[in-house]
Amino acid sequence: MTIQRPHPTAAAPAASAEIELKLALPGADPRTVGEQMAQLPLLADLAPVQQKLRNIYFDTPAQDLRQQRAALRLRSLRQGSGKTRWLQTLKTAGTATAGLSQRGEWEAAVHEGQLDPVALQGTPWPTLDQDGQWLAQLAPCFETESTRTLRLFTADDGSRIEVVLDVGSVRA
């Protein structure tokens, strides 16, 4: 589940504060979990959206981003039979309190399957890559592919709560 609120100090319009509660369900049947989620009173009236996701995560050979608790990814997203969109996302180190994770996230549309340095402008990237050497060293380190079932709930205060079930795989 993800809760997104406008980020009070965001330098870029695509920045948001993200609070996540992630649950791992090892051994659970995804179909059964999906059916049970659909019966929850909060979700019963919300139409599910199916998406196909492919994520490519990048880092330097020395794993500099991982050491800074940051992540840079490219995501291809296809909803239904629609066109595939590519998004580049930078996530920064966050905090965890009572099982909830909160971290900064900056997302921008990019050309198919290619990192775009321009999309990192207005993000904390210059703070992470202070000497400007990491960008040239970035390479894919792992990929995920999944089918996402998403239900979006908007609270009275404007917060968006995404309730998501991802079923997929990770490849290194």
PLM feature spans:
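Phosphate-end processing signature that detects enzymes handling 5′-triphosphorylated RNA
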Residues: 1-172
